[in-house]
Amino acid sequence: MMNENLDATGENFSPEEFDVERALRPLSFDDFAGQEQVLENLQIFVQAANLRGEALDHTLFHGPPGLGKTTLAHILANELNVGIKITSGPVLDKPGDLAGLLTNLDERDILFIDEIHRLSPIVEEYLYSAMEDYRIDIMIETGPNARTVQINLNPFTLIGATTRSGLLTAPMRARFGISSRLQYYSTELLSGIVERSSDILKVPITQDAAIEIAGRSRGTPRIANALLRRVRDFAQIKGNGKIDIEIAKFGLKALNVDAHGLDEMDNKILATIIDKFKGGPVGITTLATAVSESAETIEEVYEPFLIQQGFIYRTPRGREVTEHAYRHLGRVKGSNQGGLFDN
C-alpha cells in the first residue's frame, strides 16, 4: 500500500489536505523556489505576451509528480492576470466535455489539463483545431439532419501537464510552443520550502530539522510539505509544538521514511528484486504482481526516484538493482539471504 505521505501525485490526499496544500502553494514567480531556468524563461514569455496583449503560447510541463506543474499553471494565470479553468485528461470523455470548457474561456484565459497524456484519441484530435486555429466544429442534431457548425473561440492558452511525456502523440507535442521539464529539487532548496511552509502553518522549526525533512522528501516539494504536516502532528502530541531535530527524526521513523527518503514500498521493491529475482532483470508486470502494486504506480511514483538515486536501472530485459541497493538493504550480492519482506 502506498505511503500517503510520500504520494507525490496527491491522489490520496483528503479534502483537508488539499486545502492545506493550496494554502502552501506559491502564487507568483517571486514565491516559487527552484527550477531556475524554467522560471527565467517563463518570466520572459509572460512579459512578452503581456506587452503584445496576446495569449501565451500553449505550454507543456512534464516531469515527475509533485514538482510544481499545477502550481506553475496557477502562477502563470496570476502573472498574466487571466482566468484559469482546470480539468484532467481522464475526465474529458467526449468532445462535448471539452467544447463546454473552451467556449467559456475569455480572451487570453488558461485551460489547464492535468494528465494530458490520458486524453482519449477523439478528444485529442478535437483539440487540435482549437489549439491551432481557435475554432471547433460542433455537430448539431443527429441522423439525416446532422450538420456541423463551426464556432470561433477566444484566443486562449492550453497548459498541459504530464508525468509521462513519452506517451504524448507527436501531433500533440508539436502544438506546444513552450515545453519545460521540471527536475527534482536539491535538499538545500527543499529545506527553504519547508521553512517557508512552517511559517505559513505557524509551526516553529529549527534549521537542522528542516534539512532533515528535506533530505527525506525524494527531491519533491509536495512530499516535503506532506512530511512537514505529519511531523507537526508528532511535535504537537509527543513534543512541545516545536519541530526540532529529535522530533523530526522520531516522526520520520514512525512514518517509515528512511534516511534516503525511501518508504516501505520502495524498500519492498528493492528487496523483491533481490530476493525473488536474484537482483533482476525482472519485467514491470511481474514486479508489480510480486509487490501487489500497479505497474503504472511503480513507473510513475517509485521508479523515477529509485533510478535517479542509483538503486535500480532499466535494461531491455527488465529492471535490475545496483550495488547501491544491496548495500542499502545490507545484502550480499549472490547470496540467498532472506529479507525483511519474506513470508
Swiss-Prot record:
Pfam families: AAA_lid_4, RuvB_C, RuvB_N. GO terms for cellular component: cytoplasm; Holliday junction resolvase complex. Disulfide bonds: none annotated. GO terms for molecular function: ATP binding; ATP hydrolysis activity; four-way junction DNA binding; four-way junction helicase activity. SMART domains: AAA (SM00382). It catalyses: ATP + H2O = ADP + phosphate + H(+). The keyword Nucleus does not apply. InterPro entries: AAA+_ATPase, AAA_lid_4, DNA_helicase_Holl-junc_RuvB, P-loop_NTPase, RuvB-like_N, RuvB_C, WH-like_DNA-bd_sf, WH_DNA-bd_sf. CDD domains: AAA. Its EC number is 3.6.4.-. ATP binds at L24, R25, G66, K69, T70, T71, E132, D133, Y134, R175, Y185, R222. Mg(2+) binds at T70. DNA binds at R314, R319. GO terms for biological process: DNA recombination; DNA repair. Has 3 domains, the large (RuvB-L) and small ATPase (RuvB-S) domains and the C-terminal head (RuvB-H) domain. The head domain binds DNA, while the ATPase domains jointly bind ATP, ADP or are empty depending on the state of the subunit in the translocation cycle. During a single DNA translocation step the structure of each domain remains the same, but their relative positions change. PANTHER family: HOLLIDAY JUNCTION BRANCH MIGRATION COMPLEX SUBUNIT RUVB, PTHR42848. This is Holliday junction branch migration complex subunit RuvB. It comes from Christiangramia forsetii (strain DSM 17595 / CGMCC 1.15422 / KT0803).
